[in-house]
């Protein structure tokens, strides 16, 4: 299992690969070479599953097969583990920060998603809610970029959306459409759409329809099928352009471009690139948050690759 996460404010990114260590890399200023700047060897006792930078770039969250979450603080270029969050009963599969940085979401094989709140004056994290709406493993959690709304994907083939109600969190929508495990999710920059990918080799684009403050529903407006030969393990929708990248079990990366956002988005979608990227399953893709043509991929072949996507694609 490999993961990558670009630092939100600059070009360095972090990677961990096949173990319990986190490696932080930076691009050399005078070349296209990358240098490992730091290796974080403490914190976890088993393989790390996911990592995420806070929006400010000063904190890093990691989660592991050891059922814990570590919060790392960056000071003077060095990182130290400032908190270990415990509560999940099994491996923690994904962590993700809200756009405000106040909330951190985690999900686990124990069928739950947790919301942790950062108490700034105490520099501590408290559990704000435990969400147990899924009937199987929760594979992925992601926050809307525009509001405190959380979305989760599960082995039970469903997607769930959570909102804060009276200082607690509850499931407001259950989305059904995938025929097998939903592996990953990624929002469009507007927060009005997101894309999901699944074991059924399908991408789906979902749109929020609002007819009033309390009258909200999510509908599937596009199903992208026939392009992938194996399960799609990850998807990332660039916040700088309308390109969607996928990581597939057939060792390949595919890129789609949305020409225009409409209710019939399938008529505005172009399949623009295919890369036989790795020698094994590709399990992660990430667009750079500040450079619109840079994409990173990670694979079970123990490699991370950085791609420059040309504008003519």
UniProtKB/Swiss-Prot annotation:
Q: Which domain of life is it from?
A: Eukaryota
Residue spans of the WD repeats: 1-35, 43-82, 87-126, 133-172, 177-216, 227-266, 277-313
> What InterPro entries has UniProt attached to this entry?
CIAO1/Cia1, G-protein_beta_WD-40_rep, WD40/YVTN_repeat-like_dom_sf, WD40_repeat_dom_sf, WD40_rpt
Keywords from UniProt, A to Z, are: Repeat, WD repeat
Q: Where does it sit, as one GO cellular component term?
A: cytosolic [4Fe-4S] assembly targeting complex
- One GO BP annotation here? iron-sulfur cluster assembly
> Which Pfam family, just one, is annotated for this protein?
WD40
The UniProt function text for this chain reads:
Essential component of the cytosolic iron-sulfur (Fe/S) protein assembly machinery. Required for the maturation of extramitochondrial Fe/S proteins.
Check the record and name the PANTHER family matching this protein: CYTOSOLIC IRON-SULFUR PROTEIN ASSEMBLY PROTEIN CIAO1-RELATED, WD40 PROTEIN CIAO1
| Family assignment from sequence similarity | Belongs to the WD repeat CIA1 family.
Q: What is this protein called?
A: Probable cytosolic iron-sulfur protein assembly protein CIAO1 homolog
């Amino acid at each position: 299992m490999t993961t990558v996460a670009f630092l939100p404010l600059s070009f360095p990114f972090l990677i961990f690969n096949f173990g319990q260590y986190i490696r932080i890399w930076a691009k050399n200023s005078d070349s296209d070479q990358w240098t490992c700047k730091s290796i974080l060897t403490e914190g976890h006792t088993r393989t790390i599953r996911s990592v995420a930078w806070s929006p400010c770039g000063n904190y890093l969250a990691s989660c592991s097969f050891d059922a814990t979450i570590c919060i790392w603080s960056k000071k003077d270029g060095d990182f130290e583990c400032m908190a270990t969050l415990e509560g999940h009963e099994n491996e923690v599969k994904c962590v993700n920060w809200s756009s405000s940085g106040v909330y951190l979401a985690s999900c686990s094989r124990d069928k739950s998603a947790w919301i942790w709140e950062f108490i700034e004056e105490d520099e501590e994290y408290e559990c704000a809610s435990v969400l147990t709406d899924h009937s199987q493993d929760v594979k992925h959690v992601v926050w809307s970029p525009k509001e405190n709304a959380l979305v989760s994907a599960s082995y039970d083939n469903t997607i769930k959306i959570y909102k804060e109600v009276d200082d607690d969190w509850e499931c407001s929508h259950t989305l059904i459409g995938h025929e097998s495990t939903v592996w990953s999710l990624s929002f469009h920059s507007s927060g009005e759409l997101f894309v999901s990918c699944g074991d059924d080799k399908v991408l789906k684009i979902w749109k929020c329809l609002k007819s009033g403050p309390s009258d909200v529903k999510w509908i599937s407006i596009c199903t992208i099928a026939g392009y992938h030969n194996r399960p799609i393990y990850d998807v990332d929708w660039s916040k700088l352009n309308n390109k969607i990248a996928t990581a597939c079990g057939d060792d390949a990366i595919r890129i789609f471009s949305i020409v225009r956002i409409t209710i019939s988005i399938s008529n505005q979608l172009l399949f623009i690139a295919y890369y036989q990227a790795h020698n094994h399953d590709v399990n992660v893709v990430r667009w750079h948050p500040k450079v619109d043509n840079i994409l990173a991929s990670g694979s079970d072949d123990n490699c991370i690759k950085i791609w420059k996507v040309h504008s003519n694609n």
